[in-house]
Amino acid sequence: MGIRFARALTGKGPIAADIDDGRLAAAQNAGAVATYNTRDETAANRLMVETGGGVFAAVDFVGSEKSFAFANGIVRKGGKIIVVGLFGGSMSMPLPMFPLRALSIAGSFVGSLAEAAEMMRLVRGGMIDPIPLEKRPLSRAGTTLDDLRAGRVTGRVVLTPD
């Protein structure tokens, strides 16, 4: 969904990074112009070279130590990292790096009412395809949580009564 909204709002295809090739393929299908598997140790360096010095902004939809570290490694001077995901962990960064890199870090859990209205305008206007949705019986809740932790879910899973 992030890829679709970024493309609709900017008119440009964003870049996607993930640990799962299936989700990277889904990102390409949604309009990502490039994808990087973050399990590849060369991914951040390749992205830096291919973008001419890094990205201007990164949205961390996971919110883990590893995903934040990757975002921090690919954002150029003056860039911004927006953490949306709630996976958990902590970050550590020398304080002088903030002013030296002119780096901004923000958290976002919900947007404003105006942003929600804009989002719905895009959805109603047919500019955003629905998110992939899989229904599973409630009895598979444990397996579903394991799949989420392992990064095997693309889109959303809805648990329904057995």
Predicted regions and their residues:
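Glycine-rich phosphate-binding loop signature in dinucleotide/nucleotide-binding domains
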Residues: 50-53
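Residues in the short beta-alpha loop(s) of Rossmann-like NAD(P)-binding domains
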Residues: 19-20, 87, 111
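Short glycine-/small-residue-rich Rossmann-like dinucleotide-binding loops
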Residues: 40, 62-63, 85-86
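N-terminal Rossmann-like NAD(P) cofactor-binding module of classical short-chain dehydrogenase/reductase
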Residues: 56-59
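Mid-domain Rossmann-like dinucleotide-binding core that forms the NAD(H)/NADP(H) cofactor-binding site
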Residues: 1-41, 46
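Helix-to-beta-strand junctions that scaffold the AdoMet/dcAdoMet cofactor pocket
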Residues: 75-76
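C-terminal hydrophobic helical "lid"/dimerization subdomain
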Residues: 21, 69-72, 113-162
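Rossmann-fold dehydrogenase core element
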Residues: 80-82, 93-132
